[in-house]
Regions:
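Positively charged, polar, low-complexity stretches
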Residues: 1-97
C-alpha cells in the first residue's frame, strides 16, 4: 500500500505523542529483536523505533532493514527515531486510510 502525502501527514500527527516501542542498541538487529519488532508492529500498526547505533548511515541502514523485513513504510525519521507503519489486513485501527 502506497500512502499519499495527506495520509503520511495524518500518521505523523498521530505518531507525535507515541514513545518508542523498540530500541535497537549497539548489538544491532538480532533475530530475537526482529521477531519482537514483527509482533509489536502487528499489534500497534503505527510505532516508533529508536536506533542507538553508530552514525547516521548506520541508523539509516537499520531502519531501512526493519522496513524491508516487515514490509512497513517509513513515515518519518527524526534523529535516531523512526516512525513506521504497516496496516493490518483485518481489524485495522486505520481502516479509513
Amino acid at each position: 500500500m502506497i500512502l499519499t502525502e495527506q495520509q503520511k501527514k495524518r500518521l505523523r500527527g498521530l505518531g507525535h505523542k507515541l514513545k518508542p516501542v523498540i530500541t535497537v542498541g549497539t548489538g544491532g538487529l538480532s533475530d530475537s529483536l526482529l521477531a519482537e519488532f514483527e509482533s509489536s508492529l502487528e499489534h500497534h500498526e503505527l510505532m516508533k523505533v529508536k536506533v542507538s547505533t553508530g552514525d547516521r548511515d548506520e541508523r539509516d541502514t537499520a531502519i531501512r532493514t526493519l522496513c524491508e523485513y516487515s514490509n512497513a513504510q517509513l513515515i518519518q525519521r527524526v534523529g535516531n527515531i523512526g516512525l513506521l507503519f504497516r496496516k493490518k489486513k483485518k481489524n485495522s485501527k486505520f481502516a479509513a486510510l
